[in-house]
């Protein structure tokens, strides 16, 4: 079965990191690994550059700031979003509504396998509207999302 084409080529990708991801590398490394957020962003930037894709990234511990950044993405011509909503995955109708409101396709990413964790982490308010969900691959899940975007929807 062929993937549903997305009208716009993915020349511009926004990566959104939710709450507490600024603590990566030191926060519960047995769950989230030792890789820092700066390391993840650098790996993504290198992969994006090699693929001819413009990449921006943003992290916030505040739901409203993430909503504002999603809304701004529309006027910036962002073609695709990679989002790790972190704890907001399980609570935020606001993020879901913002993503629906801008109608930019997105992939949801989680470092850990949320389905092997506490039951409250099994539900996502974003997953049913996402192009895909990647979880449990550690920081490499972000690269998998970017690789999918480039391979299926075009680079620069």
From Swiss-Prot:
Residues annotated as site: Transition state stabilizer: 27
Catalysed reactions, as listed in the record: 3-dehydroquinate = 3-dehydroshikimate + H2O
Pathway entry: Metabolic intermediate biosynthesis; chorismate biosynthesis; chorismate from D-erythrose 4-phosphate and phosphoenolpyruvate: step 3/7
Entry's Gene Ontology BP terms: amino acid biosynthetic process; aromatic amino acid family biosynthetic process; chorismate biosynthetic process; quinate catabolic process
CDD domains tied to this protein: DHQase_II (cd00466)
Binding locations of substrate: 84, 90, 97, 111-112, 121
Keyword Cell cycle included in the entry's annotation: no
Pfam family, one: DHquinase_II
Keywords: Amino-acid biosynthesis, Aromatic amino acid biosynthesis, Lyase
Protein origin, superkingdom: Bacteria
Active site, renumbered: 32, 110
Keyword Disulfide bond: no
Entry EC no(s): 4.2.1.10
GO molecular function term, any single one: 3-dehydroquinate dehydratase activity
InterPro entries: DHquinase_II (IPR001874), DHquinase_II_CS (IPR018509), DHquinase_II_sf (IPR036441)
Similarity-based family: Belongs to the type-II 3-dehydroquinase family.
Function: Catalyzes a trans-dehydration via an enolate intermediate.
Subunit record text: Homododecamer.
Stated name of the protein: 3-dehydroquinate dehydratase 1
Organism of this sequence: Ralstonia nicotianae (strain ATCC BAA-1114 / GMI1000)
């Amino acid at each position: 079965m062929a993937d549903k084409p997305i009208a716009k080529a993915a020349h511009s990708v926004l990566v959104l990191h939710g709450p507490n991801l600024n603590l990566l590398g030191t926060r519960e490394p047995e769950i989230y690994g030792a890789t820092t957020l700066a390391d993840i962003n650098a790996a993504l930037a290198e992969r994006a550059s090699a693929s001819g894709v413009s990449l921006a990234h943003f992290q916030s511990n505040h739901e409203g700031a993430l909503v504002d950044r999603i809304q701004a993405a529309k006027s910036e011509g962002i073609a695709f979003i990679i989002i790790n909503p972190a704890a907001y995955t399980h609570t935020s109708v606001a993020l879901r509504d913002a993503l629906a409101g801008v109608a930019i396709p997105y992939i949801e990413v989680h470092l850990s396998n949320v389905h092997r964790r506490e039951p409250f982490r099994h539900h996502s308010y974003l997953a049913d509207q996402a192009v895909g969900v990647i979880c449990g691959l550690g920081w490499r899940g972000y690269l998998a999302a970017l690789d999918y975007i480039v391979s299926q929807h075009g680079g620069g």
